[in-house]
Amino acid sequence: MDSQRNLLVIALLFVSFMIWQAWEQDKNPQPQTQQTTQTTTTAAGSAADQGVPASGQGKMITVKTDVLDLTINTRGGDVEQALLPAYPKELGSNEPFQLLETTPQFIYQAQSGLTGRDGPDNPANGPRPLYNVEKDAFVLADGQNELQVPMTYTDAAGNTFTKTFVFKRGDYAVNVNYSVQNTGEKPLEVSTFGQLKQSVNLPPHRDTGSSNFALHTFRGAAYSTPDEKYEKYKFDTIADNENLNVSSKGGWVAMLQQYFATAWIPRNDGTNNFYTANLGNGIVAIGYKAQPVLVQPGQTGAMTSTLWVGPEIQDKMAAVAPHLDLTVDYGWLWFISQPLFKLLKWIHSFVGNWGFSIIIITFIVRGIMYPLTKAQYTSMAKMRMLQPKIQAMRERLGDDKQRQSQEMMALYKAEKVNPLGGCFPLIIQMPIFLALYYMLMGSIELRHAPFALWIHDLSAQDPYYILPILMGVTMFFIQKMSPTTVTDPMQQKIMTFMPVIFTVFFLWFPSGLVLYYIVSNLVTIIQQQLIYRGLEKRGLHSREKKKS
């Protein structure tokens, strides 16, 4: 197998993968977009018995820190809107990215409270609690490292429930502390809960869209337990009422999308019930309900949980909860993408530019793979040297395919040639290529990351298609420089158009990925010349002139 056949193999693998990816996306098409009415109904099944009742309208209070801009409803204390000032909605825009939203078109909320037999959020105890708050707006002042937002509610029996949001400077993790003061004569039984609910269908203003050739990151629910470090749960599965019902100590529940996530992390030593539910009106939920806690008469009980609402910053998420960093969607090649990203981030700490970091990591990867590349070209050169013997054998044996196969294998063995030696480096390169793609599409650090000149976002396609064209040119040069034994007219035509076909595919790919491929091709050209010189010295004539 020569290098041009290798290009054909890469193309077939690549096209096959893209067709499979498109088929996977089309198997479960999104239902038609519909308007969503605002609702706060809760989960069915395991959590419905003591879940979140329908609630009347409360007062909206705002909380602003250096990284979060939240709106909290005093009816229940749910976070109904979350803006991220550090992340613009679009490149060059002053409008912050909106993660949580409550509008007639779209619902995405982080709900929490106290359920259980005596909890104020238990539907059996009436409407959700209407908390009292001392002011309507809270701001983390300059020089202030922590901001507390206390909300209090006193039930008909005189018991006081306090829900306090605790914000820290530069932190997307928000602690939610509960205090239960029992003024009665009987123990109070309460359980904390945290629930994330979201409309299944994305309205136009939230659907970023992508080309049919692009890989799509996961949007849906997820959870983690000590036994299952990271499990995805599709919105479609929840909408079909195939619900989760798992009990475990520790862990978390989350909702994910490209670059951003929300998660509830219970902070207790007891058992938590993780559940999903179809809430109706096109809304699904994932949540947890903690093990009940008894607060004795005259005593005050304390409970806490943590809400993550923000970008998927891996090191910060890992510090909040075990395996929370796995929510960064690197697909099925995460075991390659994660170390690649760590290496890329380490390089970036020195060079300060993600584009140059990609160039450097390309040289590193290709340098590590150089022995395999050299073995590949050596194997192909030996295969070309054997072509006269193979052709003579075929003419001698005629149509006896079995004997041809036997004698060919004997010839390979005698000459110490591995017919698959040229394929192995390609098998290694393809997963690295795809893993880099997942890394570019899933790492928040590369969102809107500039390179140089006209490339202002390495995670987006080249707006002028210059990089894809350059990639096609480098591929054309590799093809022209590579000796070939392809004689089939159809294969020759396919190989002629291969740079054009790849250029068209890469028009919609992230600029960072195209940059990687250009640099990789340039390295290939250099390595080819070095390897060919060595092969010529060994008498392996690799620079055959192509027939015009």
UniProtKB/Swiss-Prot annotation:
Gene3D superfamilies assigned:
2.70.98.90
User: What InterPro entries is this protein classified in?
Assistant: Membr_insert_YidC, Membr_insert_YidC_N, YidC/ALB3/OXA1/COX18, YidC/Oxa/ALB_C, YidC_ALB_C, YidC_periplasmic_sf
**What this chain does, per the record?**
Required for the insertion and/or proper folding and/or complex formation of integral membrane proteins into the membrane. Involved in integration of membrane proteins that insert both dependently and independently of the Sec translocase complex, as well as at least some lipoproteins. Aids folding of multispanning membrane proteins.
Cite a single GO MF annotation: membrane insertase activity
Membrane as a keyword? yes
Q: Which organism is it from?
A: Salmonella paratyphi B (strain ATCC BAA-1250 / SPB7)
Q: Which Pfam families does the UniProt entry name for this protein?
A: 60KD_IMP, YidC_periplas
Q: Which family does it belong to?
A: Belongs to the OXA1/ALB3/YidC family. Type 1 subfamily.
Q: Which UniProt keywords apply?
A: Cell inner membrane, Cell membrane, Chaperone, Membrane, Protein transport, Transmembrane, Transmembrane helix, Transport
Q: Which residues cross the membrane?
A: 6-26, 350-370, 424-444, 458-478, 499-519
HAMAP family reported in the protein's UniProt record: YidC_type1
Whom does it interact with, and what assembly results? Interacts with the Sec translocase complex via SecD. Specifically interacts with transmembrane segments of nascent integral membrane proteins during membrane integration.
What gene is this protein translated from? Answer: yidC
* The protein, known as: Membrane protein insertase YidC
Positions of region (Disordered)? 28-56
- Residue spans of biased composition, Low complexity class: 29-42
Q: How does it sit in the membrane?
A: Multi-pass membrane protein
Q: Where in the cell is it found?
A: Cell inner membrane
Kindly state one GO CC term assigned in the UniProt record.
plasma membrane
